[in-house]
Amino acid sequence: MATPHINAEMGDFADVVLMPGDPLRAKYIAETFLEDAREVNNVRGMLGFTGTYKGRKISVMGHGMGIPSCSIYTKELITDFGVKKIIRVGSCGAVLPHVKLRDVVIGMGACTDSKVNRIRFKDHDFAAIADFDMVRNAVDAAKALGIDARVGNLFSADLFYSPDGEMFDVMEKYGILGVEMEAAGIYGVAAEFGAKALTICTVSDHIRTHEQTTAAERQTTFNDMIKIALESVLLGDKE
């Protein structure tokens, strides 16, 4: 049944949901990659759609910006609509010199300055990691598509406009591949409620060099990321 934030019914969502931050990107994914897509949510403009990809039922829905927003939507999808796997597909900023614009990053784990997972985990540190099989399937899908993908840790920041420039030095030292705002929260929700999750990001800007991708470049590499996510779902069905 419908929740305060999702006006769908049980069965409207597939067991796998791709989740970009922007609901308009969810609409783009549905219109570009899915067949027979239909809208299943529009509360607060957070659009959700369900269709098929190569015959496989898949849903896509926006999650908004930041851990509080994505935590609400992922929790409700899992506990109220029976979703088993969530794949966040979004953008990130790079800090390492060898990570370039348009690189695809598969988030094996996610560090964070958010306290949300500590609240969930009785004030202890929680290792926010992706599901291993989902990581492996994404890596295999990228290889099959001929797309280079980096695998490693993300950093999920609470502040987009952070005043702490020195923290980027620490991230570089620890080999953080990309900075975004949601992965650690999604991994925490999935762990708490017995689901599986993965984050795949495209590098849209470089925090050190201030380089940014153009709108056209973002769209091209965004499509690559979506192809990896969708093909990884099909590989997961073969397990």
UniProtKB/Swiss-Prot annotation:
Top class in the EC scheme: transferase
Feature type site, description Important for catalytic activity: 218
Residues that, per the record, bind a purine D-ribonucleoside: 5, 180-182, 204-205
Modified residues (N6-acetyllysine): 27
InterPro entries, alphabetized: DeoD-type (IPR004402), Nucleoside_phosphorylase_CS (IPR018016), Nucleoside_phosphorylase_d (IPR000845), Nucleoside_phosphorylase_sf (IPR035994)
Keyword check for Cytoplasm: no
Molecular function in Gene Ontology: guanosine phosphorylase activity; identical protein binding; purine-nucleoside phosphorylase activity
Gene3D superfamilies in the record: Nucleoside phosphorylase domain
Alphabetized Pfam families for the sequence: PNP_UDP_1
GO cellular component terms given for this protein: cytosol; membrane
Active-site feature positions: 205
Protein family per UniProt: Belongs to the PNP/UDP phosphorylase family.
Protein purpose: Catalyzes the reversible phosphorolytic breakdown of the N-glycosidic bond in the beta-(deoxy)ribonucleoside molecules, with the formation of the corresponding free purine bases and pentose-1-phosphate. Acts on 6-amino and 6-oxopurines including deoxyinosine, deoxyguanosine, deoxyadenosine, adenosine, guanosine, and inosine. Does not act on xanthosine. May also catalyze a phosphate-dependent transfer of the pentose moiety from one purine base to another.
Subunit structure, as described in the record: Homohexamer; trimer of homodimers.
This protein's name: Purine nucleoside phosphorylase DeoD-type
